[in-house]
């Protein structure tokens, strides 16, 4: 905003892509705009935003699954797509995985990517530090995202090394290494501590044992998250 001025549009990546397909960048999907300040409970931006000079840069929010419009005709012809193709508001990547897994009432979902994300269906929003709430098809989904995840694995091992070393691990035997496999300083979930330091030392001579310790550390974070 300081560089481009108040005429800039604040859009999440997926909202920008939807806007490009529509050739209309007015809209934003609610889940992707929580970090911008969108309040799911009241379905509104914070009142204080009204007085800010950049409030017009914010998108018009739509729920996941809402119709945004039809594809731009000239773009449809260029891409050889149907000219009446409907464009629907999507959701976040972790919410998409939750939907794809068809999670039931009492089940939860762990998504291990660059970071570790936990999701669970609830009857109402959960107001706790580090917990985010999303709404999908009139259901509430609460979740938390650790700063730890597969990012720490790729920092030390290649994909081929991970495949080979994993075969040497005995999952029934603990390493007792007590690693905290953060990629950098600071954690947000299951504990909120911006000063928490990674702990991945002392590194064992055995690479398989080291990998096992990192995986145990991730499993411990997941366990604390569910608790």
Feature locations, PLM:
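Active-site core segments that coordinate phosphate-bearing ligands/cofactors
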Residues: 2-13, 18-24, 35-52, 69, ...
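Internal glycine-rich flexible loops
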Residues: 55
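Helix-loop-beta segment of a Rossmann-like dinucleotide-binding subdomain
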Residues: 27-32
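Domain-core and long-helix interface of multi-subunit machines
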Residues: 63-66
